[in-house]
């Protein structure tokens, strides 16, 4: 399970540390946030202590109505051992009881100028990105007409050369050789390049080239959602390859199924153009037009018409 900690949250959102600074190393393991209104009212049967606790205008104003003894009681309960931190929105003033218990138990209290709803959205997106399951796959990720295409195949089969030709044709490179893939909670896969090899492409016989330096900033992008996979393999004469495109196969990456097509490689085939057309065909299918199904219907209608004319 991936983790992050409170200090990463503070740095990313430039939050103010009000108290409990010694707890900045506390781990954050879930993306959900909690607004502990019921617990402030004295309901202790359930408390999501693994979540970041958020105090907006409602929570602070209600907390102010409690007696000093009740405030201490509520804070001692809320600042349990697994609570990562407390975030106070809109730069509100924080009650002394919260500061005192925070310093005593080492639970950070952070302050942000953002509105509560805005902070919830931003922190949730940040945590989903930091805590998303990750894997690394050998391949090349490109952006072709807005479609994220992951090109896979054995070493030396021509993935990088195809990517170079695609860049020359106006498409964009995301990652070459190693593609880091993250899976969001919705099952979407996003790919990027490790920082060390970002924007770099290796061509056998030429060496390593920097795509952004050579072709400009418009030829690269840092992150792209993966929508289809193209598997390159050496042509096998006795193997049956898909010719109509009616049967759709998928590849499982982590828990997500991605459409995959297999393209046989042999001398004289322009791989870049084939991959480009595959991406355009994918877009057409997504828009509701399937050329293979359209052809099949026309063929079936023609057969029926011939059968009727013979009667």
Curated annotation (Swiss-Prot):
Its cofactor is Mg(2+). Residues 201-210 are annotated as: Important for the catalytic mechanism of both phosphorylation and dephosphorylation. Its EC number is 2.7.11.-, 2.7.4.-. GO terms for molecular function: ATP binding; magnesium ion binding; phosphorelay sensor kinase activity; protein serine/threonine kinase activity; protein serine/threonine/tyrosine kinase activity. The keyword Disulfide bond does not apply. GO terms for biological process: regulation of carbohydrate metabolic process. It is an enzyme of class 2 (transferase). ATP binds at residues 153-160. Keywords: ATP-binding, Carbohydrate metabolism, Kinase, Magnesium, Metal-binding, Multifunctional enzyme, Nucleotide-binding, Serine/threonine-protein kinase, Transferase. Mg(2+) binds at residues 160, 202. The active site is at 138, 159, 177 (proton acceptor), 243. InterPro entries: HPr(Ser)_kin/Pase (IPR003755), Hpr_kin/Pase_C (IPR011104), Hpr_kin/Pase_Hpr_N (IPR011126), P-loop_NTPase (IPR027417), Ser_kin/Pase_Hpr-like_N_sf (IPR028979). Residues 264-269 are annotated as: Important for the catalytic mechanism of dephosphorylation. Homohexamer. Both phosphorylation and phosphorolysis are carried out by the same active site and suggest a common mechanism for both reactions. Catalyzes the ATP- as well as the pyrophosphate-dependent phosphorylation of a specific serine residue in HPr, a phosphocarrier protein of the phosphoenolpyruvate-dependent sugar phosphotransferase system (PTS). HprK/P also catalyzes the pyrophosphate-producing, inorganic phosphate-dependent dephosphorylation (phosphorolysis) of seryl-phosphorylated HPr (P-Ser-HPr). This is HPr kinase/phosphorylase.
